Each structure stands twice: as C-alpha cells, then as structure tokens.
C-alpha cells in the first residue's frame, strides 16, 4: 500500500516534493507504520527500484539472450515476451520511475543490465571486443529502453505482441526494415 501510494504521487511530482505525512495520509496509515519499514522516502524509492531490477535480472538470464542457431530463437523470443509482459504488469511503477519525475539512475541501472548481458553474449561468441563495441552496446541498450519508455508514455497503445514483433524486427533486421 505504501509503495503504490508513493508511486501514484511520484508520477506527478518529484520525490523531493513528496512527504511521509502525505503518503501516510493518502494511504490511511500512521507515520509510525511507514518508519517501521522505511527510514525515509528515499529508502522506499530504493526498495521499489531494487525489487524491479532484481526481477529484470532474473528475466534476462544470459543463456536466454544468446542466439547461436535458429533453434535458440524461440527461447529468445520468450524472454522478450516475458520482459514486455512484466513491464506491462508493473507499468504504473515503470511509468513513474522512467517518467518525467523519474530517477535517471534507475534508467542507468537498466541500461547496465542490458549492456552487461550483451557483453557476456559477445564474449561467449568469442567476439573480439573493440573500441567501437562500447558504442554498439550503448546504442542497443538505449534503443530498447527508449522503445519501452515510449510505449509506456503512449499508454501502451500497441499490444505487447506488436511491441515484441517490432523489437524483434529491429534487433534481427535493423530499424530501417520497419514499414
């Protein structure tokens, strides 16, 4: 209840403008209850972010992201599908955390998860890691996060299936293959 109440407020105003008193009043709880669980607003925010990041890490296991042959593609597709469904299920949280009042560090942490998994994939393929590969990793991570943020900002007006198809086409065929 505290998390949901906080997130609803966070969608509309920055964290430094939200008070414990306001959260508790809206949630119908005492401030004492809040302080049993959290030291302050920032520890509440940190717990929300860490819970989501742990879930994302478990969904994006590296073995599900490596596509060696065509037989590996269904597992990869399932991983992308699960990620999109997870984001949709927790869209209220992701909208707030990645929205205009959101925490840039949260986006950076998501990027880092993506980039680390891609780096492991590159190494598993015995790919030589050159200077420009850092830019490639940054591009892929930023593009994927950007698509998800846009999907959330537009109230998920396309279905998760269409979004998944779009992401897969861009990843496998390039952005200019989309018509």
Predicted regions and their residues:
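Alpha-helical structural segments
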Residues: 1-8, 26, 43-63, 78, ...
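Basic, amphipathic alpha-helical hairpins
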Residues: 8-15, 90-91, 124, 174
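Helix-turn-helix
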Residues: 9-42
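Short, hydrophobic secondary-structure boundary micro-motifs
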Residues: 18-19, 95-97, 160
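Hydrophobic alpha-helical connector segments
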Residues: 61-89
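Short secondary-structure transition hinges
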Residues: 69, 74, 88-118
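Amphipathic alpha-helical packing segments from all-alpha helical-bundle domains
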Residues: 101-126, 134-138, 142, 176
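C-terminal peripheral helix-coil segments that are non-catalytic and often amphipathic
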Residues: 134, 141-142, 146-179
């Amino acid at each position: 209840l505290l998390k949901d109440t906080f997130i609803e407020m966070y969608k509309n105003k920055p964290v430094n403008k939200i008070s414990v008193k306001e959260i508790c009043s809206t949630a119908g709880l005492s401030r004492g209850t809040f302080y049993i669980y959290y030291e302050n607003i920032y520890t509440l925010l940190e717990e929300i972010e860490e819970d989501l990041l742990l879930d994302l890490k478990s969904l994006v296991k590296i073995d599900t992201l490596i596509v060696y042959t065509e037989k590996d593609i269904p597992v990869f597709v399932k991983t992308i599908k699960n990620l999109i469904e997870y984001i949709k299920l927790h869209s209220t949280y992701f909208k707030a955390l990645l929205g205009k009042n959101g925490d840039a560090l949260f986006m950076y942490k998501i990027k880092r998860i993506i980039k680390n998994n891609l780096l492991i994939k590159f190494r598993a393929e015995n790919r030589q890691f050159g200077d420009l590969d850092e830019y490639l990793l940054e591009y892929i991570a930023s593009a994927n996060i950007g698509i998800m943020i846009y999907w959330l900002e537009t109230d998920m007006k396309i279905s998760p299936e269409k979004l998944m198809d779009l992401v897969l086409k861009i990843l496998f065929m390039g952005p200019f293959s989309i018509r």
